[in-house]
Amino acid sequence: MKILRIMVMGVAALVLALALLVWFMPARWAVAALGPRLHGMRLEQVDGLVWHGRAGRVLSADGIDIGQVQWTLSRRALLGDVRLQLALQKPGVTFDGTLHRLAASVVDWSHVRLQADAALFDGLPWVRGNSLHGRLNVHIVDARVQGIWPMQLDADAQWQNASVDENGRRVMLGNFHLRAQGNGGVIQLELGDDGTGPLQATGHASLSPLSWRYTLVLKPRTNDPVLRQWLAGFGKLAPDGSLQLHGSGGLARLTSRMEQ
């Protein structure tokens, strides 16, 4: 009995020691242990605990400086209930939001706010112009993401004081807003402007993993030749200077054509 009691006490002491180690684990230990699962991302200048810590510098796999990050991880993660608050900051960009993992490939994002200089999107293939200007504000009330696709979405975004540099000239655009709502994996987007800027914009898009379609109408409110020339780069203008764009595609549309 004495030997059994000693063994039980020893196991209890070991469990307690492990619990204390996990409870007060330094964040840098956890980052080192998770290294292979970060897919090349590097966290530097790490301090704090695994439950509440920060990294003074985060680098992507290709060496891009993402910024500094702070996090708070609920201790309920020990029971499999992962709830994480993230805050990221770098010059021109701030991000904060809450993540709740529901399953291996399903997460909920809520209370997400992103503020960024529009120049962050310079170089993207769909951006026409040498440089974007203005401020982007994104608010995601809730987004349930399965894999990489939002199955449910409630969000809005604004592009304030929007303008584009092209061929050494500044193209003034105005202020725009985008509303995004989704359910069952189908996302509806509505685009508009504040009614006072140089460019009137109205648009609608529907996106799903199987198909997409959009309509967009852009019309100058002034006779600015620089703005009209920039619009003409996207397609043929109507006599009133407006531009209408529309398109659709995806697997569902391809299947429909094959059945006809």
Regions found by a protein language model. Give the residues of each.
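Extended terminal
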Residues: K2-A12, L21, P36-R37, E166-Q260
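N-terminal beta-strand/beta-hairpin edge segment
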Residues: M41-N130, N137
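N-terminal amphipathic/hydrophobic interface segments
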Residues: L14-V58
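Transmembrane beta-strands of outer-membrane beta-barrel pores
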Residues: K90, N161-S163, P220-T222
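Elongated, acidic membrane-bridging lipid-handling scaffolds
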Residues: T98-V186, T196
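Residue-level recognition of well-ordered beta-strand positions that form the cores
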Residues: G56-V58, Q70-T72, A87, N137-H139, ...
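Outer-membrane beta-barrel architecture
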Residues: R83, P150-D154, R213
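Amphipathic hydrophobic-ligand
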Residues: D62-Q70, Q89-T98, L124-V141, R169-F176, ...
